[in-house]
Curated annotation (Swiss-Prot):
Role according to the record: Core component of nucleosome. Nucleosomes wrap and compact DNA into chromatin, limiting DNA accessibility to the cellular machineries which require DNA as a template. Histones thereby play a central role in transcription regulation, DNA repair, DNA replication and chromosomal stability. DNA accessibility is regulated via a complex set of post-translational modifications of histones, also called histone code, and nucleosome remodeling. Buforins are strong antimicrobial activities in vitro against a broad-spectrum of microorganisms including fungi. Buforin II is more potent than buforin I.
Compartment(s): Nucleus; Chromosome
Bias kind Basic residues: ranges: 1-18
Family from the record: Belongs to the histone H2A family.
Record-given protein name: Histone H2A
Residue positions where N6-(2-hydroxyisobutyryl)lysine is found in the record: K5, K9, K36
N6-lactoyllysine modifications at: K9
Region (Disordered): 1-24
PTM annotation (N6-succinyllysine): residues: K9
PTM note: Monoubiquitination of C-terminus gives a specific tag for epigenetic transcriptional repression. Following DNA double-strand breaks (DSBs), it is ubiquitinated through 'Lys-63' linkage of ubiquitin moieties.
Keyword field: Acetylation, Antibiotic, Antimicrobial, Chromosome, DNA-binding, Fungicide, Hydroxylation, Isopeptide bond, Nucleosome core, Nucleus, Ubl conjugation
GO cellular component labels: nucleosome; nucleus
Length: 39
């Protein structure tokens, strides 16, 4: 219930962390797809 209120604050404070997580998230997803697709 309080996730939306905390999300804004956490997002503003974890700006650098968000950037790092965003980079690791897609990379992991792409890596998994690449491995499954045998590209």
């Amino acid at each position: 219930a309080g996730r939306g209120k905390q999300g804004g604050k956490v997002r503003a404070k974890a700006k650098t962390r968000s950037s790092r997580a965003g980079l690791q998230f897609p990379v992991g997803r792409v890596h998994r797809l690449l491995r499954k697709g045998n590209y």
